[in-house]
Amino acid sequence: MSAFTPASEVLLRHSDDFEQSRILFAGDLQDDLPARLDTAASRAHTQQFHHGQVLSRQMGDNARFSLVATVDDVADCDTLIYYWPKNKPEAQFQLMNLLSLLPVGTDIFVVGENRSGVRSAEQMLADYAPLNKVDSARRCGLYFGRLEKQPVFDADKFWGEYSVDGLTVKTLPGVFSRDGLDVGSQLLLSTLTPHTKGKVLDVGCGAGVLSVAFARHSPKIRLTLCDVSAPAVEASRATLAANYVEGEVFASNVFSEVKGRFDMIISNPPFHDGMQTSLDAAQTLIRGAVRHLNSGGELRIVANAFLPYPDVLDETFGFHEVIAQTGRFKVYRAIMTRQAKKG
């Protein structure tokens, strides 16, 4: 988090207006402007563990990672700066949560890239904080309003559910494949061998569907799941519970909080971080896997066929196999052998 995003650059055009404000930053926080903007006081709330890590190093306890913000997270704030995400239900969850806590009269700024659909903020907040567009630059829009009425927020009403081959999948706004199993994960699942045993790590677990599907035909595996997303962590816990599957689930920036070694690491790694394309997580996953695989253990991932992962796999493991593919996706397999770099 060094260079500012276009949304932050638009905010910086108005930096003089924020010098006396006590600001809560929230939403799709992709840089460290919350720690660097000159304000009377700044807090930040994020549902993304990796962004929380960066901001906590600079803001200490004034930056917090969690699914739901609390009264303590908004304490003494008179201004909200909300970065609009690419996912509208995610924005609604977060904004209804935050506006239910902030006092009437709070200044509300919403900023985001036009392609993210930020203009729909006007309609979403019309009954609570009517917005007007106050700036347009860097293909972004900046909207301002004042909180006139607090919404009633009930996190339980945002839960969703769908079924995959008799399995129940619990979801929340912001979780990958919230409305159904994606094609890439389907392809990866088709390669998993029944009656597998050992310790399995599911990185970027989303709603937990890969793990529960694997556990159904391999009940002796011991599951660990992790994700950067607070909604994903909670959704995975709920999915495991709904299917009577045991496993440990926690927030982690790829391997940052992972301890120990595993017999298998599975993943459908993301290649977007908010609105931005990013291969960092997948490359960190591949390179770091050798520090978390037992000898003979394997990394198995699915990815869009056009993404440049074969070179990283070969560089790290010495070789790789493509064990399934379609026109759009490939499932890669790499084995932990003496050829692998020990990291």
UniProtKB/Swiss-Prot annotation:
UniProtKB keywords: Cytoplasm, Methyltransferase, rRNA processing, S-adenosyl-L-methionine, Transferase
GO molecular function, one term: 16S rRNA (guanine(1207)-N(2))-methyltransferase activity
Chief localization: cytoplasm
Catalytic activity: guanosine(1207) in 16S rRNA + S-adenosyl-L-methionine = N(2)-methylguanosine(1207) in 16S rRNA + S-adenosyl-L-homocysteine + H(+)
Top-level EC class as recorded in UniProt: transferase
Name of a matching Pfam family: MTS
Location in or out of the cell: Cytoplasm
Domain of life: Bacteria
Cellular compartments per GO CC: cytoplasm
EC number in record: 2.1.1.172
Function: Specifically methylates the guanine in position 1207 of 16S rRNA in the 30S particle.
Subunit organization: Monomer.
NCBIfam families membership: PRK09489.1 (NF007023)
Similarity remark: Belongs to the methyltransferase superfamily. RsmC family.
Descriptive protein name: Ribosomal RNA small subunit methyltransferase C
Originating organism: Shigella boydii serotype 18 (strain CDC 3083-94 / BS512)
Lineage summary: Bacteria, Pseudomonadati, Pseudomonadota, Gammaproteobacteria, Enterobacterales
